Amino acid sequence: MKNIILFLFLVFNSIVLYPQSKKNIDKESIKSMCGCYEVKFEFAETFTYSEDSTYVKSPPKTLYALELAHLIKEDKNDISIQHILQIGDYGEPYIIKHWRQDWSYQNQDFYLYDSNNFWKYKNRSKSEVKGQWSQKVYQVDDGPRYEGSGTWVHVDGKSYWESTTPAPLPRREKDIRSDYNLTLRGNRVEIMDYGWAHIQDNSKIIRKNNINKTIAKEKGYNTYKKVED
């Protein structure tokens, strides 16, 4: 009888404590993105599906920057990180506000980009977002950029989070492209030994009358290498 009681006690504790310990590991992974980083942004179109014979690919793009990611909010279910960018010549650098990422645990309320500057509200069920974290990204002007939800995975020495979500054209494309109106962003945030990486597998889409047509694929690989503050 004592063995049965002990077994039930251990099972109960594992059921209750595991989600909390997993959640805490998730939170530490998110907060590990804070700090000062040398950043390298790389983007390139990988595949073209356009039927237009005059189609011109976007040129590959590589940028470097120094960025500070500062924790500005943390509570039981929310973490907010503001990114500050240093740009300009080394002799005369200047600081600008950059993007912000807000993480929420088991968030059910989403504003998802449709196309042509139109957003749609979507409520997801508790079962859909169980154990997940949503990442909402804001632009320099605090306007919404995109929002997606996924599960943090900690396995084989890796910690990563993945989500696919619709978004407007990125800033690097907005001024040079008008032949598509939606980006489907495949985001992977992975914690690395040097810092972290934001890996993207994006689709460039024409959305018309709720029908999507993919004209190109794009790969993004952004590395954040930690340096002294």
Protein language model annotation of sequence segments:
Residues M1-K22:
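Bacterial Sec-dependent N-terminal signal peptides
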Residues K73-H154:
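Low-complexity, serine/threonine/proline-enriched polar segments
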Residues K126-L184, K204:
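Short helix-loop boundary/capping segments
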Residues E38-F47, I84-Q86, T164-R172, I199-I206:
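Generic short beta-strand segments
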Residues S21-C36:
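N-terminal helix-cap/turn-to-beta initiation motif at the start of protein domains
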Residues K22-D26, E42-K76:
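Short, solvent-exposed loop/hinge segments that bridge or flank secondary-structure elements
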Residues V56-P59, L63-K73, Q82-I84, R100-D102, ...:
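Hydrophobic/aromatic beta-strand elements that line small-molecule binding cavities or substrate pockets
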Residues N181-R188, D193, A197-D229:
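Acidic, serine/threonine-rich low-complexity disordered tracts
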